[in-house]
């Protein structure tokens, strides 16, 4: 089942902990709270997210990464809909991450990640319908610490996600450029932003991005007489964000915007 919503106000609050050698691929730890009320409606979308990755150094500049991520999505649907909303009230997305990254040469780091996923309402026992497989391979050229006028980072990759409905990998591109001491730009999907740095602690950013979810309904619902086994939501978000760096590796984010 797909449902489109507009005029949604979004707020996010999260903590992120990262290690510089691995931050190009993933955070090491993250806590996040998202709240999205629907405009002119009592409907609400709330997401709680927790992420933890544990890197194991195998050799110099080589890491094996094990981790997991849990998303709990709470849908408070108060409007009248032509279907039973009770089975949709709580969704769970659980990822298990296995990754490996190493320096290919002086300029390029290579990484790969496999992510088995459980995405379901979890009303009953887990079945094969609740299981999905995601993954990706990436090449990163990071010159942010280089002694050049405009440091940059380029990430190229291929990602595979069984929930997209496309049986082939999709390209991934992200480009970051430090324009000057106060400004930086990041272009890519699912998020692009322009950031202004007041100092080493405080920064403000304008961003656009994509968000959403896909999950299996263990207790199917019916829409216009047809059985529906899955639910998905895709949103485009634009807004402003504020970052506060407690340390080089611990960051507080707050975001507000609309879709």
Residues of each region from the PLM?
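Residues that define the transmembrane beta-barrel architecture of outer-membrane proteins
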Residues: 44-48, 88-94, 127-135, 167-171, ...
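Repeated loop/turn-to-beta-strand initiation elements of outer-membrane beta-barrel proteins
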Residues: 58-65, 107-110, 144-154, 182-185, ...
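Short glycine/proline- and aromatic-enriched beta-strand/turn motifs that initiate or cap beta-hairpins
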Residues: 23-80
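Transmembrane beta-strands of outer-membrane beta-barrel pores
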Residues: 33-39, 68-76, 102, 116-122, ...
């Amino acid at each position: 089942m797909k449902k489109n919503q507009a005029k949604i106000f979004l707020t996010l609050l999260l903590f992120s902990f990262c290690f510089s050698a691995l931050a190009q691929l993933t955070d090491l730890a993250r806590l996040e709270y998202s709240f999205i009320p629907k405009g002119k409606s009592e409907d609400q979308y709330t997401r709680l997210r927790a992420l933890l990755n544990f890197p194991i150094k195998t050799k110099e500049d080589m890491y094996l990464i094990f981790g997991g991520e849990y998303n709990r999505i709470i849908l408070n649907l108060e409007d009248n809909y032509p279907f039973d909303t009770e089975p949709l009230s709580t969704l769970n997305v659980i990822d298990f991450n296995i990754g490996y990254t190493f320096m290919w040469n002086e300029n390029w780091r290579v990484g790969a990640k496999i992510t088995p996923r459980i995405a379901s309402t979890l009303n009953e026992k887990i079945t094969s319908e609740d299981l999905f497989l995601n993954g990706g391979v990436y090449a990163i050229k990071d010159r942010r610490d280089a002694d050049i006028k405009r440091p940059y980072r380029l990430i190229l990759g291929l990602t595979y996600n069984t929930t997209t409905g496309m049986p082939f990998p999709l390209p991934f591109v992200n480009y970051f450029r430090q324009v000057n001491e106060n400004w930086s730009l990041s272009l890519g999907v699912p998020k692009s932003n322009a950031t202004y740095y007041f100092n080493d602690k405080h920064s403000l950013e304008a961003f656009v991005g994509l968000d959403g979810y896909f999950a299996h309904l263990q207790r199917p619902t019916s829409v216009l007489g047809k059985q529906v086994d899955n639910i998905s939501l895709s949103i485009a978000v634009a807004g402003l964000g504020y970052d506060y760096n407690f340390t080089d590796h611990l960051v507080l984010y707050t975001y507000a915007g609309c879709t």
